[in-house]
Amino acid sequence: MSNNDLLVDLYDLDFSSIDIPITIKRVLSPNSDDVVEYIGKHFSPKWASEAKAAMYKNHPTCFVAVDNKEIVGFACYDATAKGFFGPLGVSDDYRKRGIGKALVMKCMEGLFYDGYGYAIIGGVSEKTQKFYYDACKAIPIVNSRKVYNRLIDR
């Protein structure tokens, strides 16, 4: 299976369609260490690094899903590259509840109101592409060049 970049037409999305019983918040700097710790514990250090890039801005581009004052998911945009969405993660116990889609849409809304017309979701596995198509109508970019090829360990 190969990874593809995906394209999202932000003009074609309905940002009011998300209704879940979980709160989604834009990360504030006093919470950034908690978010980085959560991501490192549940996902990966590289995702935690990407989230740091999204949080340490005047206008943070990282959102968290919160249930009973506990972080249960996160998503970022403009972290690794401008106009790119990701990473996205939801705690195992909270999957299949629409939280991932809600986080995707919150970031897509952020991208739209930050002036973007389109978003790119980088390096998506074939297995995960259906999730993004269902969440935000993301389609593969044929022959896309991968931003992650610039990683030091590649």
Give the location of each predicted region:
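Conserved acetyl-CoA-binding loop-helix of GNAT-fold acetyltransferases
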Residues: V90, K96-E109, D134
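Flexible loop/turn segments at secondary-structure boundaries
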Residues: D33, T80-F84, K127-K130
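A conserved beta-strand-loop-helix scaffold within acyl/acetyltransferase catalytic domains
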Residues: G40-D92
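Conserved acetyl-CoA-binding loop of GNAT-fold acetyltransferases
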Residues: Y133-N143
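Acyl-donor-binding surface of acyltransferase catalytic domains
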Residues: M1-D19, R145-Y148
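A short beta-loop-alpha structural element at the N-terminal edge
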Residues: I22-V35
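Short glycine/proline-centered loop/turn elements that form peptide/ligand docking sites
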Residues: V104, S125-T128, Y148-R150
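Conserved GNAT acetyl-CoA-binding A-motif
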Residues: L111-V124
